[in-house]
Amino acid sequence: MASAAFKETDMAGALSPVSSQTTNSSSLKGLSTLSSKVTSVLSTSYADSEFRDALSLLDSRGIQNTAEARRRLRLDLHREVIDSNGEIIDEFGRVADQLRRIGNTLEKLNNSYAEMKTQVTKAHECTSPVLQEASTLIAQKRQVEIKQRLLKSFSGHFLLPEDEVAILTLTSEPVDDRFFNVLAKARRIRKDCEILLGFENQTSGLQIMEQTSRNLDLAFQKLYRWIQREFKTLNLESPQLGSAIRRALRALAERPSLFQNCLDFFAEARENVLSDAFFTALTGTTSGGTVDHSVKPIEMAAHDPLRYVGDMLAWSHSATVSEREALEVLFVSDGDAIAKGIRSGRDTEVWRLVAEDGEEAPEFDPIKALNELVDRNVSGAARLLRQRVEQVIQTNEETILAYKLANLLGFYRVMFAKLLTEESILVECIRNLEAEALRQFRSLMRDYIANLQGEFQHVPPTLEPPDFLVPSLQQLDAIMKTYETSLTASGDREADFQPILAEALDPFIAGCRNIGKALAPPKDSVFLINCLMAIKRVLMPFDFAKGRVEELGEEIGRESSKLSESQYLFFREASGLAEVFDAVQSLTDKPEDVERVRTLAPLAPAALVHASQRLDDFLPSALLDALENIKYLQDSTMARKITEEAAEKFCLNFEHVEYILMYADESAGQTPQAERSSEDDYGGPQLLRTLFPRTTEEIRVLLS
């Protein structure tokens, strides 16, 4: 680098022989100066940032490392500093000139401001009285305008003009939007009069309230008469309440008595219309005797009693739904407004306050009011429906039809309860009809059972279900299929069906049990199982009979146990081992029990030989003979299972006998392999297993 080279050269020059020769003639002071310079150069740290910056500056200036450059370096640097200072002084001179010009401008502005301030002060002194007078006049004008607006607002808010009073009270004026607007204004005036009554001077408030109340009374009377006329001309075949009459009813709700009178009038008219329509649907003729050829009479089209009742109920349901849809626009959409009007209207009817003294007034429920009105509208048709259905129920002599009628009525009872309420007249009517149909069903069932009392004494020779049970189960199956498709309001269908089973099934089960009591075992159990299995097969497909199916299964299990015990007794007696089983039943492998074996008569050699021979005669046909005992059991799988259980129990007892005989032989010092001499002729201790050679495995094979 240039700076490094410059320094190295400078240092080399300072130490060269030539330099030394030049300074030989110098004084001792010159030598000291040179020495200090060399020491200073050598002590300079190249890590010093300022030193590095100085070297970088020399590099950037492009100075050549010559003797001339080294001599002029300091002079050039001083000249550059002087030139820079001169430029700065020139710039400050120009700044001073600009500041002098700004000072002159500010002086001129101050002079102009002082002159303007003087002129404004003079003008203010001249106009001040005029402005004060003008302010006073403006304030007075503002007060007059406020009083004018207040008077106008008071008159417009608390007073009805003559034309609006005429619209509100005169019957010659129509009930239209203008009427309702004026009515709303009059109601607002009466409410706002309460504010006037709060002042010390109540005269104006009392007068305005009295006049407004009188106009409102006349308006509600006019509205009441108008609604009555509209109801008379309303299309009652399709009672869609228009927006005008709905609005009128909402307004009339502030007079609960008048509102209720209108609803009563409407309900009475609809009751008559629906009664006539139902009669026409039944007979094809109107109540006046006119034939309506557009109607297909239900009485002529429905020859089946069930369809006849179903068509009548379907017509009633359709009419009820139509009534509700037509009226719910008023009670659901406008229910809140009606409820609010009735609440405010109770305070205006003094006689209601007296009648309800000390009692909390009932809250208006739109849905409840709708249900009550619809129920009243169809009450006439409900009475006619009750008469016709009662006639069908009382003339019916078929058990299944009686239940189907009750089930159909129960279905519609649930439907109407969802549509109206449980307390409605129509639902109560159908509930009574359903109860009457069930009474008729129970009566017919009892008559049917009474007619079968003679058949309850006869048992089929094949122990199959008696003749009376088969049609009875077919009848029960039809009843259960009907109930399965029914709509019930209760969540526990099984509990609801128990009374039906008590009437349609329990008497027949009791009859089968009574018949079985006259039979000897095992026929009684076979007969009862056949009957119970037939009943169980009918009940199993239905979920709501699971409890009864389980009860039947338990009873069948008990009877099966009896049959199994009977088959076991047959194996004991027919095999000739009954006495042997009884003899060893209480014996164990204890020495004292084993010693008693040869003292027991059934286990004597001659008795064992006889028992063994009889067992051999029994075993080849034992299983077939046992199955023959219960051959009339219709469930062959159950018969085989019962016989197998009895055979297993027989084998277990036989195995116990086998073990006891083996223990007896061992206690006598003999082994099962010892052979008895043919010359003994039972004279000495005999090998019991030789006398009784059959094994348990052989018995299991022969009885399996």
Swiss-Prot record:
Keywords of this entry: Golgi apparatus, Membrane, Protein transport, Transport
Stored SMART domains: COG6 (SM01087)
Keyword Transport listed: yes
Subcellular location: Golgi apparatus membrane
One GO cellular component, as annotated: Golgi membrane
Bilayer topology annotation: Peripheral membrane protein
Top-level lineage group: Eukaryota
InterPro entries according to UniProt: COG6, COG6_C, COG6_N
One GO term (biological process): protein transport
Role noted for this protein: Acts as a component of the peripheral membrane COG complex that is involved in intra-Golgi protein trafficking. COG is located at the cis-Golgi, and regulates tethering of retrograde intra-Golgi vesicles and possibly a number of other membrane trafficking events.
Family affiliation: Belongs to the COG6 family.
Protein name: Conserved oligomeric Golgi complex subunit 6
Species of origin: Pyricularia oryzae (strain 70-15 / ATCC MYA-4617 / FGSC 8958)
Upper taxonomic lineage: Eukaryota, Fungi, Dikarya, Ascomycota, Pezizomycotina
